[in-house]
């Protein structure tokens, strides 16, 4: 499998008072095409910061982020933004859907911002939402959708511009266990069907165990192959 994302000796520190808080140090990891990897760890371990750096939303204090072979973390802002928009899709714990737009429009809009014609964007939105079980809910606004349905729209939006990499930060964290399981199944199925690489942060060890492999972020270090509590 070809490598699509690599973190090389990455360290992240934040200013705190007169000193610095080191979230993690010397992290190394790779993500290959078509691979779905769980990122687990306790609250405050730095999972969100790691995903933000992997998605070129934050720069590491030191080290490098390689996206499809390109050393990207120190590139100019405009070039990092271009790589991010062309390559990476994001799903967050909060769906961040635009309340004034319906489900289809929330998926159409980012495609049109990227330059796609409206008819083509609408067809892709319809395809993705139907695949995710929302074919009858295209014209419903977020307030008319359940929590699980809202998160499915967010997944469709993340995939609409055909990224190579999907980064998901606790995508089912706000849902009850039964709904979370259904949304997770949909996320994994559509990710695999499109051949994407995915890095998914979760506190749910049962869900993590269903992915291809798991990385444990603990005390500033990544541990691969750690035995997960069940």
Where does each model-flagged region fall?
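ABC family nucleotide-binding domain
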Residues: 3-222
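ABC ATPase nucleotide-binding domains
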Residues: 229-230
């Amino acid at each position: 499998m070809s490598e699509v994302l690599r973190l090389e000796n990455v360290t992240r520190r934040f200013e705190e008072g007169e000193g610095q808080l080191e979230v993690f140090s010397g992290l190394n990891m790779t993500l290959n095409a078509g691979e779905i990897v769980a990122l687990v760890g306790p609250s405050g371990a730095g999972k969100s910061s790691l995903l933000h750096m992997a998605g070129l939303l934050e720069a590491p204090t030191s080290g490098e982020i390689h996206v499809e072979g390109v050393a990207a973390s120190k590139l100019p802002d405009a070039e990092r933004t271009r790589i991010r928009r062309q390559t990476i899709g994001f799903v967050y714990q909060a769906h961040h859907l635009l309340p004034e737009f319906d489900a289809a429009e929330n998926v159409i809009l980012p495609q049109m911002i990227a330059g796609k014609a409206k008819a083509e964007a609408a067809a892709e939105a319809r395809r993705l939402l139907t695949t995710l079980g929302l074919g009858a809910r295209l014209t419903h606004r977020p307030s008319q959708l359940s929590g699980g349905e809202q998160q499915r729209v967010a997944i469709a939006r993340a995939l609409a511009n055909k990224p190579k990499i999907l980064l998901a930060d606790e995508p089912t964290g706000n849902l009850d266990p039964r709904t979370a399981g259904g949304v997770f199944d949909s996320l994994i199925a559509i990710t695999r069907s499109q051949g994407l690489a995915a890095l998914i942060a979760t506190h749910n060890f049962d869900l993590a165990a269903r992915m291809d492999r798991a990385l444990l972020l603990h005390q500033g270090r990544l541990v691969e192959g750690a035995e997960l509590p069940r």
